[in-house]
Amino acid sequence: MPGILVRPDQSFEEAYRLFKKQVDRNLIVTEARARRFYEKPTERRKKEKIAARKKMLKRLYMLRRYESRL
């Protein structure tokens, strides 16, 4: 869980900015949105399979694009 220590000379805005940065780095908001509604295991596997295919096609596209430049 993110947390910061506020120094006496630190303003509220600065402390808030540091806290928001930690929250963004830890992907807390993204995970909370993903867990907002229950997702069945079959739906999760389906999404993972689609994401893996998309990633593989992107790598293949980039590889072919790189090879065509040689």
Curated annotation (Swiss-Prot):
Q: Which Pfam families match?
A: Ribosomal_S21
Q: Alphabetically list the UniProt keywords.
A: Ribonucleoprotein, Ribosomal protein
Look up the record and give one Gene Ontology term from the biological process aspect: translation
Under InterPro entries, the record lists: Ribosomal_bS21, Ribosomal_bS21_sf
GO MF terms listed in the record are: structural constituent of ribosome
Name the Gene3D superfamilies for this protein.
Ribosomal protein S8 (1.20.5.1150)
Cellular component per GO?
A: ribonucleoprotein complex; ribosome
Family, according to the entry, reads as follows: Belongs to the bacterial ribosomal protein bS21 family.
Q: What is this protein called?
A: Small ribosomal subunit protein bS21
- Which species is the source of this protein? Nitratiruptor sp. (strain SB155-2)
> Taxonomically, what lineage is the organism?
Bacteria, Pseudomonadati, Campylobacterota, Epsilonproteobacteria, Nautiliales
Encoding gene (name): rpsU
